[in-house]
Amino acid sequence: MTKKFHTIIVGGGCLGTASAISIARKIKKNGGDPNSVCLIEKMVLGGGLTARHSGIVRAANADPTAAQIAKISSDMWLNVENIWDAELEPDRYGAIWIAKKDSNNGNKKWDQLEQQLKSSNIRFNSIEFEKARELLPSFINISDDETFYHEPDALQYDPADVRRALYEAVRRSQITLEEKTEVLSFRRNSSGNITEIVTSAGVMKC
């Protein structure tokens, strides 16, 4: 039997789940059924988080546009309860960036990055060796020929907590979740638009 949905999202990671939640919220706001949004995941929701993700959210980036997007992302993670309707608290350890000193006992490239990030309202400051030693755990070895930069607003999330929040967000959003479901192929109509997805659990129409 073919299942019918308004929208099908393939991939149950953070991005796929966030997309499904957003669409379901829009449908519900317009008087529709949020259950008509289906999220397909070939394994389990957020399964890749513990395998590939350290849970670090940071904004510092050499590309100005990427840094601004990352800053928006960081702010959204801090506001995730209002976006996903699920509680998720980060550890606010910050991050220390370490670079080799140049012949002038500094690092011009990183100093330029510091100024560039400041113009984007991203806190990223050069710190002395002693301050870096104070902030870093003792098992991390550092030396005087290195220069240090502190990003105090970097966040770290426990991947297990993120997965729990993903499940809670999907439940509260009333999204249809199809786990352990592999996408086998797509079917298109005469206009070339995808209208059906063939999965290991059957055909789904959208």
Each language-model region and where it sits:
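Beta1/beta-strand and adjacent pyrophosphate-binding region of the FAD-binding site
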Residues: T2-L15, C38
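Glycine-rich FAD pyrophosphate-binding loop
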Residues: A24-A51
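Short helix-terminating capping/connector loops at secondary-structure junctions
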Residues: N30-N35, E87-D91, E178
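Short loop/edge segments at beta-strand edges and connector loops
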Residues: E41, E128-F129, E179-T181
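Short beta-to-alpha linker loops that shape the active-site pocket of alpha/beta-hydrolase fold enzymes
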Residues: M43-L45, A132, L166
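Dinucleotide-binding Rossmann-like beta1-alpha1 core, especially the glycine-rich loop
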Residues: S54-S138, D145-E146
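Helical element adjacent to the flavin cofactor pocket in flavoenzyme catalytic cores
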Residues: H150-C206
